[in-house]
Amino acid sequence: MTLFVRRALILTFLVGWVTAPLAADGASAAAAPEARQFDFLVGQWQVSGEVKVSGLVAMIHGRPKLAGSWKAWRTADGQGIEDELTLADASGTPRSTVHFTRSFSREENCWKIMGRDAYKGALPPATARRQGDEMLMTSSGTTPEGKHYRNRTHYLAITPAGFRMVQDRSYDEGKTWDTGAMTLDVRRTGN
């Protein structure tokens, strides 16, 4: 047996040995079509935005401005998205650096989203669904003061060049909403 034939047989054996368990446990199963709904996030982005405030602070200073970057990539298995959003205030002081993991659940027919802020720790888990031309993400949690809230985050005006993110907040189980509590305008800077 020649060296070439011997190597070809070994390679054939190894490929079969590695791929057989993958096929058996379903790891090579195709992603659900919905697993592409957050693909608009993939790339590098420049972020500008503002936070809604009221009362004396708003009268004196106006709405606090935010600036930052957002980068996102598909997970290695192709079933989800990982992304990192970094925001600073107008003076350049870091306010938030959040790493998100987004994966589509076929069983629940929605996106499951986990986030961790470098300054605040773990964020409440969220879910998201495509609704017409937007992605709608919802979550609930408790403020540091112990006040329960709900968030709904709209990803709107989605184009290859950018999108808008608007976050609403409710402190009464969704009966009333503070709309536009935070607004981010996101523009693509790279792939």
Which residues fall in each region the model found?
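Positively charged, low-complexity intrinsically disordered regions
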Residues: 7-8, 131
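Hydrophobic small-molecule pocket/channel-lining residues, especially in calycin-type beta-barrels
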Residues: 24-191
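Bacterial N-terminal signal peptides
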Residues: 8-20
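Short, functionally important structural connectors and interaction interfaces within domains
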Residues: 6, 14, 30-33
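N-terminal secretory signal peptides that target proteins for export/translocation
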Residues: 1-5
